[in-house]
Amino acid sequence: MKVPAFSTVLLAFTFDLRDETGSLLLPLTAAQILWINLITDGLPALALVFDRTPGVMHQPPRPAASPLLDRSSVRFITATGSMKAGLALGLLGLMPRLGYDVDVARATTFHFMAVGQLLLTYPCRHTWMRPLPNRYLHLAVIVGVGIQLAAAWLPVSAKLLGNAGIPIVAWGVVFGSALLAWGLAEVLSRLAWRADARVSSATDRTTERTP
């Protein structure tokens, strides 16, 4: 979650986004960022413990000097973080053009960041191996979305998060954008790991030809 949130705020500063009063427009407040981290790093992380990846125990150990994140992982994290930040800023600029005020635009962006990150748990599982379906992850995502909806509708949580109520149309934008982010992340995942597979295959062929 850190990369999309950081990228969103950074891009907002870079493009000098401002509201109708001329004040700097922050896409997310500190409380909202903490909340997103809480619901997206909690239940989904626990559910991923139950992931089943066929053949993973037959893989040789990684070299001791290998980095924690390989090139494919770095490419995927950077690409998806930038993509999600771009969509978030797009919502922040789109909603006022549709006639909604800045508070609704910021709330729409907040809900998209939360719901979108929950859905991005699925492409984040995909590496050069494809895990088997995980019903615990499905449950974690459903519960996470439910908690996000409750946070939007309960007056206490809405006040604590500085979150304005949004109409049904805006919820359609939230879920539509989240599904779009999911689909784009799936494509980026396949491209990242396919490129890594080509490099590994070329390296193996070179090694085989070396006397």
Language-model features: locations:
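C-terminal transmembrane module of polytopic membrane proteins
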Residues: 107, 111-211
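Membrane-embedded transport module
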Residues: 1-128, 153
